[in-house]
């Protein structure tokens, strides 16, 4: 899982992720922004579910993060879109609306994000 951290002209941190993990970047850009307490909450939840059968989730404005002891899933809240609402012959493209990654990989990105933000 490759990632890149950038700052836009206003100084806002932007996260870009490799193909298949774009939603992880969107989650950082839309949900975390400068809210490092959200990362505290996620890291605490990761410690709680690691090595157990439990899971944890947090719904945000645009994305929901879910984790169990081994993996993290981030999905766009709009994925609750019903197929019945689609016009005939149309399909809903959701490749960039859902990402799965391993817990350890995700926590490495969280740590790198914190480090990048602290270098303001």
From Swiss-Prot:
UniProt-listed InterPro entries: UPF0231
**Superkingdom in the source lineage:** Bacteria
Q: Name one Pfam family in it.
A: UPF0231
* Family affiliation: Belongs to the UPF0231 family.
Q: What is this protein called?
A: UPF0231 protein YacL
Gene assigned in the entry: yacL
Q: Which HAMAP family match?
A: UPF0231
The organism encoding this protein is Salmonella typhi
